[in-house]
C-alpha cells in the first residue's frame, strides 16, 4: 500500500538490515522490554517472531520511503542533516529506505499493534502516516477483529500522540505493570489504548 510518501510492504527476511539498524540502537529501543539487539543474529531471531512462518495471524509491514519520491521533498522540508542526529540518517531517508515497522506482533488474546522507526525519521510524521495506512490494511485483512489495542509507556509521549492521532482512545493506566532495567524508575506505568473498527461490525 502506498501513501503520499510511504510504501508499506509485508515484512520479510530481506528487510533484516534495516530492521537491525533500528533495533541495534539502545536509545531507539529503550521503551521495549526486549531491549536492543547486540548482533545481526539477535535481530534476525527477534524479527522471526513477526514473519508468517512463526506468526501466521500477524499483519506486519515494513515501512519504506517511496522509491519514486523526490529526495528533495525531504531535504527541502528538513534540511540535509538527519533530524534525529543519527549518522545513518542520510542513508535511511533515501527513496526505498527502510524507515520502520508497524504491525500486530501478537493476536492472542487480542490483536496488539506495535511500531518502531529509525530515529533519523522522528518528527517527520512518518509514524502517523504509516499507522493510518496500516489500520486501513488491517481492518480489510482481518475482518474477524472488532478492535486493536496498543500499550505505551506513560512517559513515551511521542508514541502516545501517534496513537491518539490515529483514533486510539485511552482505556486505562496500569501502574507498575512492567520493568525496564535501564530506565529510572525501573518499575514502569503503561497506557492501554484501544481502536475500534470504523464501521463497528465484524465478520459473521
Predicted regions and their residues:
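Acyl-donor (CoA/ACP) binding surface of acyl/acetyltransferases
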Residues: 1-29, 60-204
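Conserved GNAT-fold acetyl-CoA-binding loop/helix
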Residues: 27-49
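Short, P/G- and charge-enriched loop/turn segments at secondary-structure junctions
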Residues: 47-51, 178-181
